[in-house]
A protein has these predicted regions:
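Sec-exported extracytoplasmic/periplasmic mature domains
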Residues: 32-40, 54-63, 141-145, 178-179, ...
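Active-site metal-coordination/substrate-binding segment of hydrolases
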Residues: 87-158
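A glycine-rich helix N-cap at a beta->alpha junction
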Residues: 175-192
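N-terminal helical capping/dimerization or prosegment-like subdomains
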Residues: 16-104, 306-310, 322
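Acidic, glycine-rich active-site loops and adjacent beta-strand->loop/helix elements
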Residues: 97-99, 158-166, 189-194, 225, ...
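Second-shell loop/turn segments in exported
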Residues: 17-21, 36-44, 121-126, 226-230, ...
Length: 438
């Protein structure tokens, strides 16, 4: 009898409510350590990041599998928290280890310092997406530590190269280890809560169900090399400039996407006009790089024979990328200019927003933010979600924080950061999601 009482007592202790003060402290310290790992892509060497996750999971008795996908430390990770109902397929919590490069001169602090200042934690990847990765990791660790068994298996999946298209990350894993990712749902980065992006003064929380297609293009112009002191009509630089101007003059995008209609209904019929809301309603083109010149360092007095630029084009779901590029070539209409697609297109339909998981996300958001208007959302940037949507899996973008426009603007920019209070709430929201039955 005494032994039975001890067993029952230990079970009750194991399943107690988490000590959230302790969880918050652990989560913040972990994020600081994670931000101090410069997992920049290129080269996407994610070994140190993967080892950090593996060590934290091991502390609570969870095994992490590491998958080497490339020769330069490109490591993907999978860990599984077992659930009760084995008839249900898992929920995949997906995040990525890699981050984009930084312009150190433009930061007021070390971008890989994990610095806490002014109520925020600063560093490359804080928003995209190491902060969310730690929310997912801490939700899994906390469930295990406190003896809480989820309804279904939870698979934590961290990838090495989302920032370069996922060829060694999600695509590689789906090709080589598909059984590890045989799931019913995927939860990724994407939607977020805001009071000043969709409509000022109104708390709207988006769950992303669709995103624009990245169509990265290289435009190359050819000309005649010459001495800079003697201008010529066949100057590759001038040809490139004219081609870019014509390329950027893209026609209107056409009819409204159904997800945008849902977002408009959520905000009362009209969204504020800003770079985010403008981008999600039309095809966009951004000139991102220019490359020209001869020599290293480049000689000012030499007219080069070639010049090139890259355009980051983002197309609405359903837009035919080949037709878009063909129309661009026709506008340029110059045999000296080539337009080349340099990325893989992932055009997939929107994920349904009537699933049990979507309703669970809505319920969790409303529990923590009762005044929030919850809506499906389209995002202008790309994630790894379409690679699962292409296979028929519902994939949702869920960034469980309320973020301001200035904070959102730090993604892929300088002084990247997230508010610490929202980070802590995000850990609890992620925990509530994976603890739920859906």
């Amino acid at each position: 009898m005494r032994l039975l009482l001890i067993v029952i007592s230990s079970m009750l202790v194991a399943a107690q409510e988490p000590d959230w003060k302790a969880v918050d402290a652990e989560a913040l310290h972990l994020l600081q350590r994670y931000l101090r790992i410069p997992s920049t892509n290129p080269p996407a060497d994610t070994r140190a990041a993967a080892e950090l996750f593996r060590a934290e999971l091991a502390k609570v008795g969870l095994e992490a599998k590491l998958f080497a996908a490339g020769p330069n430390g490109q490591i993907n990770l999978i860990a599984r928290l077992p659930g009760r109902d084995k008839t249900k397929k898992p929920l995949v919590l997906m995040n990525h280890f890699d981050v984009v490069p930084v312009d150190r001169a433009a930061w007021s602090m070390d971008p890989f310092g994990g610095i806490v200042k002014d109520g925020s934690i600063w560093g490359r990847g804080a928003l995209d997406m190491k902060g969310i990765g730690v929310m997912q990791l801490m939700a899994v660790i906390t469930m295990k530590k406190y003896g809480i068994v989820p309804d279904r298996d939870i698979v934590l999946f961290a990838t090495c190269d989302e920032e370069s298209g996922g060829d060694l990350g999600v695509r590689w894993m789906l090709k080589n280890h598909a059984a590890e990712l045989d799931a019913e749902y995927v939860l990724d980065e994407g939607g977020f809560g805001t009071r000043d992006v969709l409509q000022k003064g109104k708390l709207v929380f988006g769950i992303s169900v669709a995103e624009k297609q990245p169509a990265w293009l290289r435009i190359r112009a050819k000309g005649t090399a010459a001495h800079g002191s003697q201008p010529i009509p066949d100057n590759a630089n001038m040809t490139l400039l004219r081609a870019i101007e014509k390329a950027m003059a893209a026609p209107p995008s056409g009819k409204q996407h159904p997800v945008i209609a849902q977002m408009l209904a959520a905000v009362g019929g009209e969204m504020d006009s800003n770079k985010f809301t403008n981008a999600i309603q039309k095809n966009t083109l951004s000139l991102t790089t220019l490359k020209s010149g001869v020599g290293d360092p480049v000689k000012v007095n030499v007219i080069p024979s070639t010049a090139e630029a890259t355009l980051d084009c983002r197309l609405l779901p359903g837009v035919n990328a080949e037709e878009f590029i063909s129309e661009m070539r026709a506008r340029i209409n110059d045999p000296r200019v080539t337009v080349e697609l340099i990325t893989t297109i992932d055009d997939t339909p929107a994920t349904s927003f009537t699933t049990p998981l979507f309703e669970t996300l809505r319920r969790v958001i409303k529990h923590h933010h009762p005044t929030a208007e919850v809506t499906p959302m389209m995002v202008p940037y790309s994630t790894d979600s379409p690679k699962f949507r292409r296979k028929g899996l519902p994939a949702y973008g869920f960034t469980p924080m309320i973020l301001t426009a200035p904070v959102l603007a730090t993604m892929h920019s300088d002084e990247e950061r997230i508010p610490i209070d929202q980070f802590h709430i995000g850990v609890r929201m992620m925990f509530d999601v994976i603890k739920s039955v859906f």
